């Protein structure tokens, strides 16, 4: 039996003045599916994410979203005058308590910093707090907007492993916007490549988890995606 998509876009257009950002884009995301969105700068990734977050409305087309959504941005945007646990439950309905926040912080291995002030957190800790803030909302759709781009290499790998583990536990539908092909291949079930506001290619990733960049299938798919993004051509011309 086919599952009803948790996200459904059909012939979505988005224009700002005379500039077309998304042009007839159609995309479904199944419950529990992990989708990575790749594309060059200006391809429409951020515009699509803003539509899925409910921050903008499309100029034209059909868009169906779940009620419970959460976004983790590259910058966690924690309020410096509220301690970590209060940031985690900020805006949550039904009078959430410190216990709710600590439970979410425990999932991201940050419960020991519940009473800390945001400015005392490292970059990785702040991003963990951002993930906890998303988890406490029990989202049907989790949107990740290049959440690891500002982190050092080791912290980025640790955060990727954490996101993979959280997805295995919760099986929330996820859309990850990233420029990192390896990150997309490590985490996602499916990769969508945007170009000029349209879906230029989609690839299902059938490589068993846990995945390793050194595996032949991983390396082959990486080369294919780099080619779709124009990276190999740029390197060859350099």
Swiss-Prot record:
It is a peripheral membrane protein. The complex is composed of two ATP-binding proteins (SsuB), two transmembrane proteins (SsuC) and a solute-binding protein (SsuA). It comes from Granulibacter bethesdensis (strain ATCC BAA-1260 / CGDNIH1). This is Aliphatic sulfonates import ATP-binding protein SsuB. Belongs to the ABC transporter superfamily. Aliphatic sulfonates importer (TC 3.A.1.17.2) family. PROSITE patterns: ABC_TRANSPORTER_1, ABC_TRANSPORTER_2, SSUB. It is found in: Cell inner membrane. ATP binds at residues 39-46. Part of the ABC transporter complex SsuABC involved in aliphatic sulfonates import. Responsible for energy coupling to the transport system. GO terms for molecular function: ATP binding; ATP hydrolysis activity. It catalyses: ATP + H2O + aliphatic sulfonate-[sulfonate-binding protein]Side 1 = ADP + phosphate + aliphatic sulfonateSide 2 + [sulfonate-binding protein]Side 1. SMART domains: AAA (SM00382). InterPro entries: AAA+_ATPase, ABC_transporter-like_ATP-bd, ABC_transporter-like_CS, ABC_transporter_ATP-bind, P-loop_NTPase. Residues 7-221 form the ABC transporter domain. Keywords: ATP-binding, Cell inner membrane, Cell membrane, Membrane, Nucleotide-binding, Translocase, Transport. Its EC number is 7.6.2.14. GO terms for cellular component: plasma membrane.
């Amino acid at each position: 039996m086919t599952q009803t998509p948790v996200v459904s876009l059909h012939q979505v257009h988005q224009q700002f003045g005379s500039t077309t950002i998304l042009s007839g884009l159609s995309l479904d995301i199944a419950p529990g599916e992990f989708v990575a969105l790749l594309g060059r700068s200006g391809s429409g990734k951020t515009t699509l994410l803003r539509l899925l977050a409910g921050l903008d409305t499309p100029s034209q087309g059909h868009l169906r979203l779940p009620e419970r959504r959460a976004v983790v941005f590259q910058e966690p945007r924690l309020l410096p005058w509220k301690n970590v646990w209060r940031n985690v439950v900020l805006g949550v309905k039904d009078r959430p308590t410190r216990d709710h926040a600590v439970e979410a912080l425990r999932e991201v291995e940050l419960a020991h910093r519940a009473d800390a002030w945001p400015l005392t957190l490292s970059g990785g800790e702040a991003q963990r707090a951002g993930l906890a803030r998303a988890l406490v909302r029990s989202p049907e759709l989790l949107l990740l907007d290049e959440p690891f781009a500002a982190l050092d290499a080791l912290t980025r790998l640790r955060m990727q492993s954490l996101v993979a583990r959280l997805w295995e536990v919760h099986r929330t539908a996820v859309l990850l916007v990233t420029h990192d092909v390896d990150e997309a291949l490590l985490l996602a079930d499916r990769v969508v490549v945007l170009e000029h506001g349209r879906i230029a290619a989609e690839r299902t990733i059938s490589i068993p988890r846990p995945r390793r960049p050194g595996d032949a299938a991983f390396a082959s798919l990486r080369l294919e995606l780099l080619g779709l993004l124009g990276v190999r051509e740029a390197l060859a011309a350099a």
